[in-house]
Design a protein with these regions (language model features):
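N-terminal catalytic cores of NTP/NDP-binding nucleotidyl/phosphoryl-transfer enzymes
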Residues: 10-73
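Residue-level signal for inorganic ion chemistry
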Residues: 30, 81, 119, 175, ...
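Residues at the starts of beta-strands that form the adenosine-phosphate
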Residues: 49-51, 87-88, 118, 144
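Glycine-rich, highly charged phosphate/nucleotide-binding loops
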Residues: 69-77, 99-107
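A glycine-rich helix N-cap at a beta->alpha junction
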Residues: 76-90
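Classical nucleotidyltransferase
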Residues: 100-203, 284-288
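Phosphate/ribose-recognition catalytic cores of enzymes acting on nucleotide-derived substrates
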Residues: 193-305
Length: 305
């Protein structure tokens, strides 16, 4: 899969090969997104290049209306798109120039230049200045358009907003129902205080490689971890480690991996969230902390997931 980062649309070169494009921001890549992208990939099998044309950030984020946290930061989004069979991804930098681009200019200077013959998008897809561009406008320009209608699960619309609420509330089974996978975050293992080793409970300290959305509740979660392409059960704490420190400037993400004893400093890992166990708490001593960690581990071992 080829990735193109476009900071200025004037840099887009006219292409000769015909493309089928999926249009949208696609944060979370839920089942409705997967349907849009999958249909584009399938249509491209008849001699086209399959492409996703998206933004490097959401307009809401650009205008400061939402936080920067994402369900699928760029690295994760690329991984999922490649798994769906996409040939090319175009990330348009959402800057002042793109913000003021008319809908007609979007069609002529992006879709037409990339030789897009067919477009797949959601029912609420909008583009151009003030979001005035609609799928019908693309259709009027001579490009074939297929619009994905609203999809629901249990009577609720499938949307990124709903997914984010699931993550914030720790409702990971519901997240899986809407996406087909458990919520995950990834990054590098870095050295922490190494206090876990002193109580025979070593942890991998994660430094995120993207601006991932985290659950609202600090505490302990049953998780799985992928390290060196192998999957292990794990128990993960998100929070400030109040037993160790009173500082609340930075949240720590620490994972104890079951049946594992390897040095993985500097390795990239991915943590998959399954269930919330308990809230983070301040213990009177390290002995009390150690006893609770043993209980957390036992609970994790006994759960079938």
């Amino acid at each position: 899969m080829e990735i193109f980062n476009i900071s200025d649309i004037s840099d887009i070169k006219e292409e000769n090969k015909n493309r089928v494009a999926a249009l949208g921001f696609f944060d979370g890549i839920h089942k409705a997104h997967q349907s849009i992208i999958g249909r584009a990939v399938e249509a491209a099998e008849k001699g086209y290049i399959s492409a996703v044309i998206t933004l490097d950030k959401s307009p809401k984020e650009y205008f400061g209306k939402t936080s920067e946290e994402s369900l699928t930061p760029t690295n994760k989004k690329n991984e999922l798109l490649e798994n769906l069979g996409v040939n090319e991804v175009y990330y348009l930098e959402f800057n002042e120039k793109l913000q003021n681009l008319s809908a007609e200019e979007f069609i002529n200077n992006i879709l037409k230049k990339l030789n897009v013959d067919k477009v797949f998008c959601g029912f609420d897809y909008r583009f151009g200045v003030k979001g005035l561009g609609t799928p019908d406008l693309i259709k009027d320009s001579g490009i074939e358009v297929t619009v994905q209608e609203k999809e629901k699960i249990d009577g609720e619309k499938i949307s990124t907003t709903v997914l984010k609420e699931f993550v914030r509330k720790g409702e990971f089974s519901k997240y899986k129902k809407y996406t087909g996978r458990f919520y995950s975050i990834s990054g590098l293992v870095v050295k922490g205080r190494q206090l876990g080793r002193t109580i025979n409970f070593p942890t991998a300290n994660l430094e995120l490689d993207g601006k991932y959305l985290l659950p609202d509740t600090n505490g302990v979660y049953t998780t799985k971890i992928k390290v060196n392409n192998k999957i292990y059960k794990s128990v993960t704490n998100i929070g400030y480690n109040p037993t160790v420190s009173d500082e609340k400037n930075k949240k720590f993400i620490e994972t104890h991996i079951l049946e594992f004893d390897e040095d993985i400093y500097g390795e990239r890992i991915e943590i998959y969230f399954y269930e919330f166990l308990r809230k983070e708490q301040k213990f009177e001593s390290f002995d009390h902390l150690k006893e609770q960690l043993k209980l957390d581990k036992k609970t994790c071992e006994e759960k079938d997931y």
